[in-house]
Amino acid sequence: MASEKVETVVAGNYLEMEREEEGSKSTSGKLSRLFWHGGSVYDAWFSCASNQVAQVLLTLPYSFSQLGMLSGIIFQLFYGLMGSWTAYLISVLYVEYRTRKEREKVDFRNHVIQWFEVLDGLLGKHWRNLGLFFNCTFLLFGSVIQLIACASNIYYINDNLDKRTWTYIFGACCATTVFIPSFHNYRMWSFLGLVMTTYTAWYMTIASLTHGQAEGVTHTGPAKLVLYFTGATNILYTFGGHAVTVEIMHAMWKPQKFKMIYLIATLYVLTLTLPSASAVYWAFGDQLLTHSNALSLLPRSGFRDTAVILMLIHQFITFGFACTPLYFVWEKFIGVHETKSLFKRALARLPVVIPIWFLAIIFPFFGPINSTVGSLLVSFTVYIIPALAHMVTFASAPAREVIRSCT
């Protein structure tokens, strides 16, 4: 029964998105379409892959030192596949919601559908409130982490200023993301972001193998249960990037083609995370327990400085990915979401950036935040809630009656 319903949904048409694509081809300049106006399957893949791994690429070797090599590899594979599965469930729910609304003649040309709206339309206000709380809190702290990470990374190549001062500077830089209207406009940034993480991952791999094992290196593995689960939550956070799946899907010309994109993106990301984390842990072993950022152990060189700079730029991109859904929520709350004035929307978004900037300044450490976000917020936001929502949405009639009686 559920599979038949899903098939019907996948066959749905997204007429206004197709009209928008045609309009874009006829009115936008070639440069605008090339660098700014994306909505293809490839754009969605670049967005998913680029957003999935950022600062955590540098902390995964630290997680390996807490977990041990074998557990680190197993957790990456497990959470990667689980994340791909729940991203698929989210895509099915989005398509179901979108199809129902289009049958009611709802026009989404000036409105970005978000996860909490999908839950509201399919399951009601209690699910909406649950999704809104966890998603917004997760994205809020995800944005804070990116600002803190910027200051932490730049310190490796320029320590003339303290980390808090660098947070002031990068907060101002990241505030410019208020001028990026939606995920349609991340085409160039998503592509560059993936190039940057690819370079950094392979630099870490090659530099570690070239360096060889440090003198007296040991690989103790999990010494304490707390450390073991701390390492696991960091990997959980790594593959929990599909909190923005709905927004990425909505930016596609044909969202029904999203189904396998996240899985393919995850497989590519694993080709970056597994070799880099394994190589750095092999080279430095237990030294990583006191060096959460892998770049701090690699010898300084032009290649390392390049990796630092590229990761700084990538964190700007990731900040935009995490913050843009928060911008949308705020725009809808104050009633400016559907306005066509980019300047008005940018001004309206500034109150979202300021508290994030403030939190990054007063909490200049991202390790504990990573663990908290991974263990609680990611678990519910991108694993538990989507799985439960899918089961309830496509439950049989008797099962739905039982659920109603319980709620």
Predicted regions and their residues:
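Membrane-interface "cap" regions at the ends of multi-pass membrane proteins
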Residues: M1-Y62, Q66, G83-Y88, N110-V112
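Membrane-interfacial loop- and helix-cap regions that link adjacent transmembrane helices
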Residues: S3-V10, W36-H37, V92-L139, V144-T167, ...
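Alpha-helical transmembrane segments of multi-pass membrane proteins, especially transporters
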Residues: S47, F75-G80, A265, R345
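Central hydrophobic cores of alpha-helical transmembrane segments in multi-pass inner-membrane proteins
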Residues: Q55, G80-V92, G171-F179
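Extracellular loop-to-transmembrane helix junctions
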Residues: P61-K105, R109
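Hydrophobic alpha-helical transmembrane segments
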Residues: S63, T176-P181, F358-P364
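Alpha-helical transmembrane segments and their membrane-interface exit regions
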Residues: M82-W85, C174, T197-T200, V378-I385
